[in-house]
Amino acid sequence: MIDFTTWWQHLPSQMNPVIFSIDGIAIRWYGTMYIVAFAIVYLLSKYRISNEKLPFDKTFPGDALTWAMGGVLIGGRIGYILFYGFDWFLQDPVGTLIPIKFGNGSCAFSGINGMSFHGGLIGVAIALWLFTRTHKVDFLKTVDLFIPALPLGYTFGRLGNFINGELYGRVTTSAIGMYFPAAPTVALRHPSQLYEAFFEGIVLFIILWTIRKKAPWPGYLSGLYLIGYGTVRFFIEFFREPDAQLGFVFLNFSMGQVLCFLMIAAGIGILVWSKQRAENADVMMGGKR
C-alpha cells in the first residue's frame, strides 16, 4: 500500500492533462478551467446585481464578460510573447501568433503554448474600457463589480497549470515537494501552482468578497486587488522556478516579480486617483444642490 507522502510526491505524474478526445480533438483540463473560471465570475456577479442593488441589469455581466474573454485570450497571449517569449517571436512571428502549422499541402492546429496572467489582466482592462465606452457606463464601477469574484475564478486557472505539470516551483527538501515530469531534474519541487491557487485565489477571494459592500468609492476594490495579488504573487515567486528562457531578469528577481512590482504600483496609483475622482464628484454634486 502506497503511503500518503509517496502518493503526494508523485501526484503530478498520475494526472492526464487531457480529459477526453473526440475525433482526434483533445479536450483539456486547462481550457476547461478557463471556462469554469468565467462561469464563476459570471454567476457571482449576477448574484451581486440581484442581491446588492447594484446599478446594472441582469444581462450586463454576460455582455461585459464576453468582451473580457476576448481580452484575456488576446492579452494573455501577447503578454506572454512580450514578457517571456520575445526571442521566439523574432524567430517565428507567425507561428507564435497563429496556432496553426502549415506543411505538405495541409494545416494542423498546433495549440497555444504560453499565456501570461499580467498580459491577460491588461487585455481584460482594455476590453472592459472599450465596453464601458461603447455602453456609456462607468469603467471603475464595472471593474469593481467583477473584482471580488475574480480570485476564485483564478484559482481554477492555477489548478489547470498544476494538472498540466507546468509553472512548477524550485527544488526543495520539504516533504510537501512533488516530482514534476516536465522539470529538468528529478528532484522534489514546490507545488507553486497550488500555493498560488490558495493564496492568490482562495485567500484573496475571501478578503475581497468580505469587504465588497464596504468599498468607500468606485475603484477601491480594483486598486486593492492589484496591490493584494501583486504582493502575494511577488513572495510566492521565491518558491516558483523562473522561466528557463529568462532566468532572473533583474538582480535576483524573476520577470513575474518585476511585473508584480509594477502591478502594486498601479494599484496604489488607482487607489489615489479613484479617491480623488470620487471626492471631486462629491464636490460637484454638492455644488449642484
From Swiss-Prot:
Any one annotated GO CC term: plasma membrane
Segments passing through the bilayer: 24-44, 70-90, 111-131, 219-239, 253-273
Pathway info: Protein modification; lipoprotein biosynthesis (diacylglyceryl transfer)
UniProt-listed GO biological process terms: lipoprotein biosynthetic process
Kinase among keywords: no
MF GO annotations: phosphatidylglycerol-prolipoprotein diacylglyceryl transferase activity
Origin superkingdom: Bacteria
Enzyme Commission number(s): 2.5.1.145
Major localization listed first in the record, in broad terms: membrane
Bilayer disposition of the protein: Multi-pass membrane protein
Entry's localization field: Cell inner membrane
Entry keyword set: Cell inner membrane, Cell membrane, Membrane, Transferase, Transmembrane, Transmembrane helix
Residues that hold a 1,2-diacyl-sn-glycero-3-phospho-(1'-sn-glycerol) according to the record: 158
InterPro entries the UniProt entry points to: Lgt (IPR001640)
Family membership: Belongs to the Lgt family.
Stored PANTHER family: PHOSPHATIDYLGLYCEROL--PROLIPOPROTEIN DIACYLGLYCERYL TRANSFERASE, PROLIPOPROTEIN DIACYLGLYCERYL TRANSFERASE
Protein's job: Catalyzes the transfer of the diacylglyceryl group from phosphatidylglycerol to the sulfhydryl group of the N-terminal cysteine of a prolipoprotein, the first step in the formation of mature lipoproteins.
Protein name per UniProt: Phosphatidylglycerol--prolipoprotein diacylglyceryl transferase
Organism, scientific name: Chlorobaculum tepidum (strain ATCC 49652 / DSM 12025 / NBRC 103806 / TLS)
